[in-house]
């Protein structure tokens, strides 16, 4: 989350970041500078562009992660954690953009899982969000070969989904 001056916070009202800030974050220490109860932010007002932005941002991360191992003969130098993180960010971006396009996005990961259950996009999304929620699935016990295979699988799925989303 970036630091945004209080005077400019309203300029970001239709963004995912603003919605998540207002709806899902709590002040743990100190005074709350915002009157969250009067901001009335609705996820339905998040524009489709935010989903496109998520897909572009996470797609670039997926590409950069792939560049770490493409063309290398020795896969021992792969940073498995970075590769795993970018794969999961891409999976989550697919699900989040789907929810945004259907006006069903929610700040809570648990609620997002409930809202996407009847979708064809559920497999990758559910896997990634469940891993995030349960703090499991870290790549330490996964072989480089398995991670690279997963990267190719999600890359193909991600590209197909992205092109459909943009149309």
In which residue ranges do the predicted regions lie?
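Short, well-ordered alpha-helical segments
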Residues: 117-130
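Conserved NTP/Mg2+-binding pocket subregion across the NTase superfamily
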Residues: 1-102, 109-120, 136-167
């Amino acid at each position: 989350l970036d630091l945004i001056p209080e005077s400019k916070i309203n300029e970001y009202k239709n963004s995912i970041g603003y919605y998540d800030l207002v709806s899902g974050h709590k002040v743990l220490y100190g005074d709350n500078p915002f009157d969250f109860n009067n901001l009335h932010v609705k996820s339905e007002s998040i524009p489709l562009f935010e989903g496109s932005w998520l897909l572009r941002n996470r797609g670039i991360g997926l590409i950069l992660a792939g560049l770490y191992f493409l063309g290398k003969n020795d896969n021992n130098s792969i940073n498995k954690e970075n590769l795993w993180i970018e794969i999961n960010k891409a999976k989550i971006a697919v699900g989040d953009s789907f929810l945004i396009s259907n006006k069903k996005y929610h700040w809570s990961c648990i609620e997002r899982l409930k809202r996407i259950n009847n979708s064809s996009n559920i497999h990758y999304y559910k896997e990634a969000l469940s891993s995030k929620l349960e703090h499991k699935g870290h790549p330490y016990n996964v072989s480089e070969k398995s991670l690279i295979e997963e990267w190719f699988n999600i890359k193909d799925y991600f590209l197909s989904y992205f092109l459909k989303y943009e149309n």
